[in-house]
Curated annotation (Swiss-Prot):
Protein name as it appears in the record: Agroclavine dehydrogenase
Pathway(s) served: Alkaloid biosynthesis; ergot alkaloid biosynthesis
Keyword Nucleotidyltransferase applies: no
Lineage: Eukaryota, Fungi, Dikarya, Ascomycota, Pezizomycotina
Classification via InterPro entries: Ergot_Alk_Oxidoreductase (IPR051604), Ergot_alkaloid_biosynthesis (IPR019901), NAD(P)-bd_dom_sf (IPR036291), NmrA-like (IPR008030)
Role summary: Agroclavine dehydrogenase; part of the gene cluster that mediates the biosynthesis of fungal ergot alkaloid. DmaW catalyzes the first step of ergot alkaloid biosynthesis by condensing dimethylallyl diphosphate (DMAP) and tryptophan to form 4-dimethylallyl-L-tryptophan. The second step is catalyzed by the methyltransferase easF that methylates 4-dimethylallyl-L-tryptophan in the presence of S-adenosyl-L-methionine, resulting in the formation of 4-dimethylallyl-L-abrine.
Amino acid sequence: MTVLLTGGTGRTAKHIAGIFRQTNVPFLVASRSSSAGTAENHRKFDWLDEETFPNALSVDQGMKPISVVWLCPPPLYDLATPVIKFIDFAVSQNVKKFVLLSASVIQKGGPAMGKIHEHLDSIKDVTYTVLRPTWFMENFSTKGEIQCEAIRRDSTVYSATENGKIPFISVVDIARVAACALTAETLKNSDHILQGPDLLTYDEVAQALTGVLGRKITHTKMTEGELAEKLMEEGVTPEEAYMHAAMDSMIKSGSEERVVSDEVKAWTGVKPRGFINFALSEKAAWRARK
């Protein structure tokens, strides 16, 4: 068995790769460019260039063929189209198993990853698992992410969620579940909502960060329109800005509170990390204010 990880320079794939190195699972990483720690396993791959598709599935001498693919869709407005094209190519090369990274609010047949989910479900003799994590904790700590820069620069977090709650999850836990799914003997054509253990409002996130950092962090509450404008000011495309703001409004109405999931422990046998644990480990990300 050889696993192909798309989105190879992304946060989740990096953690999956680390797990596979420790457990000696053969894998390749597909992305436009390599990164530290993945160069020896790298295959040049571009979702928008079908000529790179064969290269992504090419294995080194002595390796078994690719048998399962981690699908991490690209950050495109019409992300489903290129991913579906690659799935169809992979199936033509006898790949029969896929694990898709989707999102908690996106069901089969919905927009974006929902279309990919629906397509996987329609292919005869293909088995799959869809992972639907809620919002990433690491959005608060990754350099360049709007929330991270807002904490560093302005000591605030922005949202249009009002008092809506989110069970934020760490990329580390998503990767652990993904590694289990990618190495499972069988996949059951199922989807799984992944959540962290703490159901938090953004007010509570700000309060937790205040305690960890020793300086006041606030929650700047906005309307959906105000948040979209703020995101565009920070360089986000209009399509992404309006989509993100609309998702905040869904959170405001309770979209992330309706399902309680213990899938992380069910898959891995270990409870997911809590927000305070995450914040303590990432303090350095918020220390410098520029």
